[in-house]
Amino acid sequence: MPRYLEGWLADVVKISLNRERINKVRERPIYLLSKFIKSTIDKNAIIAEFKRKSPSGLNENRDLEEYVKFMEENGAIGISVLTEEKYFGGSYSDLENAAKIVKIPILMKDFIVTEKQIDTAFNLGADAILLIVKILTERELINLYEYARNLGLEAIVEVTDENDLKIALMYDFNIIGVNARNLSSLEVNIRNARKILEMIPNDRIKIAESGIKNKEDIIELKKYGADAFLIGTTLMKDPNKIKELI
């Protein structure tokens, strides 16, 4: 069982534990997110997120095909697709559809606590998954990471505080995401994210997540070691912002 959790996090994990595996034959090659990030030289490495809503208040109803095409055409190096249904309005269909459209890495963004979810990510065309340290025991984190890697998928190991980071740095996780949003209170603390980013060794790929609103935010996060930027709410509200952020 995952860690002891409260509130909406406990609910979303309970739902995740019961989600069914989707059995389909993968038709898409695997696009390595790490490779796309490392090969980004003359622009900012942006992973554009598609989500219809969020517990923090977002509520947008955009066309997925139009959105992901636009992001790819305007320089995004990856697409993040929320597949959690209750709190983010996502679906496995969104992931499957996005995978048919773009030829850049796709992250299945969800509260992953079972191997079934990872199988589904692979089968529907995801190239990477998110593993959130906060909701997993150490043993679960390692097992799920290794399971994903054995399928050829990459995993972003997400941390929100120093405790999470301490666990993440004990293992050879090559991509670490630093979420500026506290998953319990939903408050964004960019200062804390900068502090965490600075503590991560440079041999890891560092992705800054949440609270990024403009080019200045990206410039600032780069000073603290961020290699890539996962941006959702800002781009869902105004997709044209990608041109400014790149």
Curated annotation (Swiss-Prot):
Its EC number is 4.1.1.48. Pathway: Amino-acid biosynthesis; L-tryptophan biosynthesis; L-tryptophan from chorismate: step 4/5. GO terms for biological process: L-tryptophan biosynthetic process. This is Indole-3-glycerol phosphate synthase. CDD domains: IGPS (cd00331). One of its GO terms (molecular function) is phosphoribosylanthranilate isomerase activity. InterPro entries: Aldolase_TIM, Indole-3-glycerol_P_synth, Indole-3-glycerol_P_synth_dom, Indole-3-GlycerolPSynthase_CS, RibuloseP-bd_barrel. It catalyses: 1-(2-carboxyphenylamino)-1-deoxy-D-ribulose 5-phosphate + H(+) = (1S,2R)-1-C-(indol-3-yl)glycerol 3-phosphate + CO2 + H2O. The gene is trpC. SUPFAM superfamilies: Ribulose-phoshate binding barrel. Keywords: Amino-acid biosynthesis, Aromatic amino acid biosynthesis, Decarboxylase, Lyase, Tryptophan biosynthesis. NCBIfam families: PRK00278.2-1. Belongs to the TrpC family. Disulfide bonds: none annotated.
